Amino acid sequence: MGQTKSKIKSKYASYLSFIKILLKRGGVKVSTKNLIKLFQIIEQFCPWFPEQGTLDLKDWKRIGKELKQAGRKGNIIPLTVWNDWAIIKAALEPFQTEEDSVSVSDAPGSCIIDCNENTRKKSQKETESLHCEYVAEPVMAQSTQNVDYNQLQEVIYPETLKLEGKVPELVGPSESKPRGTSRLPAGQVPVTLQPQTQVKENKTQPPVAYQYWPPAELQYRPPLESQYGYPGMPPAPQGRAPYPQPPTRRLNPTAPPSRRGSELHEIIDKSRKEGDTEAWQFPVTLEPMPPGEGAQEGEPPTVEARYKSFSIKMLKDMKEGVKQYGPNSPYMRTLLDSIAHGHRLIPYDWEILAKSSLSPSQFLQFKTWWIDGVQEQVRRNRAANPPVNIDADQLLGIGQNWSTISQQALMQNEAIEQVRAICLRAWEKIQDPGSTCPSFNTVRQGSKEPYPDFVARLQDVAQKSIAIEKARKVIVELMAYENPNPECQSAIKPLKGKVPAGSDVISEYVKACDGMGGAMHKAMLMAQAITGVVLGGQVRTFGGKCYNCGQIGHLKKNCPVLNKQNITIQATTTGREPPDLCPRCKKGKHWASQCRSKFDKNGQPLSGNEQRGQPQAPQQTGAFPIQPFVPHGFQGQQPPLSQVFQGISQLPQYNNCPPPQAAVQQ
């Protein structure tokens, strides 16, 4: 490791010396050990880095990118390396010009002499460029032990000394006295350039802040108090302020003047700072005009209408949203509503917005519903008391008086609001390709569908089908009560007609159905079925009438009168004494007519009916009728089969027992 450090130190000796001088002059102290560690990492991951070093800021930015890539791959890069890299990159930024910086080796050998001559002949900008190109040549070309320190001081610090001479208040306390371009005395030679000497640094003096100035056109110039009307704003500095100068109020000096600040101005300034200036352009803006001569107090100020077209970014967002989500998706409705209410849109703007965002078939639907809405609005304007002087040509942006943009820009606020409402309503009626609008009667809640989703579908269908808002609200409330699944319907049934005045019925229904279908709800339903207690804590009651006592709220089998006073009621109603042991089952005191036992006290089954008739003999029937065999020649002489069976039945019947007469004789 020691050999590697010594190798790095000898390889980049000149460049290391220059970097240390540059950083020390900027008020930053970096140890040689940390710089050697930095160049070890650079040599490991950036083999393209030149041995003679470079002053090109692009090369150091490239080093940072490659070190980040190495860190992502798992290589360990010390924190000091990142700190030193950032410090060196920041120190090289003032030396960059519009042209690419050259490598150190490309500078001519006589640059030290030519540099001083050129700086006296050229302007300040050209001087800085030449200084950036040739500043490192004396350090790189020779060893630090052979450098003329007086000449090196003049080469490295000419512009810094000039700036210090112009702005002495920006220099630290130790160097508050302006200095010219004279050479350094022998005692003030930088420590890093003194050969084989060790000088103890004075740590009591604070380091000089490293400051630099951008070109004049890039500097921020705060607005004057008289221009923007901010009483607490400090006056602008007389000289060149250090970069960057943080703004106090407004972020855009080129914005139009305003007499008082507002939140809208701050938002617009922030968007302009971020680069999104087109998003805040209003199609039509009304700017107050200065009062003319003879204007009386109390008169409304005269305004001037100015039109600006939509930004390409806004139209692109609308087109992508319609293509990806659909014209009536929640995202598109919110975006369209914000554009409509945040801008003063004229009919021409609505047409451009629809043409650029919708497909041809969707635009045809939008135009159709637009015309239909205009006709309805014109009828309302004529029926109003007093009539509203807004015709169909104005709402559509057609005709001789309203066909141009300049004419539409002068529309009244009431006409703008009517156009907005009509176009938003027409946009909502646009149907996606291949989809049909179902009837609100057919919208029903699924068995596992959440109640809010069902209501959202119902509202969407009703909004496309019913034009009148009051009728749409009544239909939605009715269908939200009639068409949910049985679980939600049982939850909202107690709220029918009991919602307080001023409360939203749909919101109350949604609250009542909150959590329906979940695991907790199913567990509560099971507990309800077991205990008879509903979710609200009330006992479930039967709505019918008891057939025993005539009261409402229970069945006959659960009648408390029947269960408690059954015997007394039977005795008083029948007029008989209480029954004794049942003669049928022998195991209960009740009447035999009321016995419902299927087994007696011994476990023997009991028949359902006590008295039965005698069992009848089974009648055996054959599959085919019996036909006796008769020869072919005796068919006419054979008697019918019925006569044969009748004769057989008249014969005496004998069995194993002798007749009674024979038994007596024996």
From Swiss-Prot:
Region of interest called Disordered, as start-end residue ranges on this chain: 170-189, 223-264, 598-640
GO MF entries: nucleic acid binding; structural molecule activity; zinc ion binding
Biased composition (Polar residues): 604-622
Segments forming a coiled coil: none
The record's account of how the chain is modified after translation: Myristoylation is essential for retroviral assembly. Alteration of the glycine residue leads to a block in the budding of particles and an accumulation of Gag inside the cell.
Cystine residue pairs: none
GO cellular component: a single term: plasma membrane
InterPro entries: B_retro_matrix (IPR003322), B_retro_matrix_sf (IPR038124), Gag_p24_C (IPR045345), Primate_lentivir_Gag_pol-like (IPR050195), Retrov_capsid_C (IPR008916), Retrov_capsid_N (IPR008919), Retrovr_matrix (IPR010999), Znf_CCHC (IPR001878)
Location(s), subcellular: Cell membrane
Covalently lipidated residues, kind N-myristoyl glycine: 2
Record's compositionally biased regions (Pro residues): 232-247
Signal peptide residues on this chain, from the entry's feature table: none
One GO term of the biological process aspect: viral translational frameshifting
Keywords: Cell membrane, ERV, Lipoprotein, Membrane, Metal-binding, Myristate, Repeat, Transposable element, Zinc, Zinc-finger
Topology of this chain in the membrane: Lipid-anchor
SUPFAM superfamilies to which the protein is assigned, alphabetical: Retroviral matrix proteins (SSF47836), Retrovirus capsid dimerization domain-like (SSF47353), Retrovirus capsid protein, N-terminal core domain (SSF47943), Retrovirus zinc finger-like domains (SSF57756)
CCHC-type zinc finger locations on the chain: 544-561, 580-597
Domains: entry comment: HERV-K Gag polyprotein contains regions homologous to the matrix (MA), capsid (CA) and nucleocapsid (NC) proteins from infectious retroviruses. Evidence suggests that HERV-K(HML-2) Gag polyprotein can be cleaved into mature MA, CA and NC under certain circumstances. However, the exact boundaries as well as the size of processed Gag proteins have not been precisely determined yet.
Anything else known: Insertional polymorphism. Provirus present in 29% of tested individuals.
Similarity annotation: Belongs to the beta type-B retroviral Gag protein family. HERV class-II K(HML-2) gag subfamily.
PANTHER family noted in UniProt: ENDOGENOUS RETROVIRUS GROUP K MEMBER 24 GAG POLYPROTEIN-RELATED
Stated role: The products of the Gag polyproteins of infectious retroviruses perform highly complex orchestrated tasks during the assembly, budding, maturation, and infection stages of the viral replication cycle. During viral assembly, the proteins form membrane associations and self-associations that ultimately result in budding of an immature virion from the infected cell. Gag precursors also function during viral assembly to selectively bind and package two plus strands of genomic RNA. Endogenous Gag proteins may have kept, lost or modified their original function during evolution.
Protein's UniProt name: Endogenous retrovirus group K member 113 Gag polyprotein
UniProt lineage: Eukaryota, Metazoa, Chordata, Craniata, Vertebrata
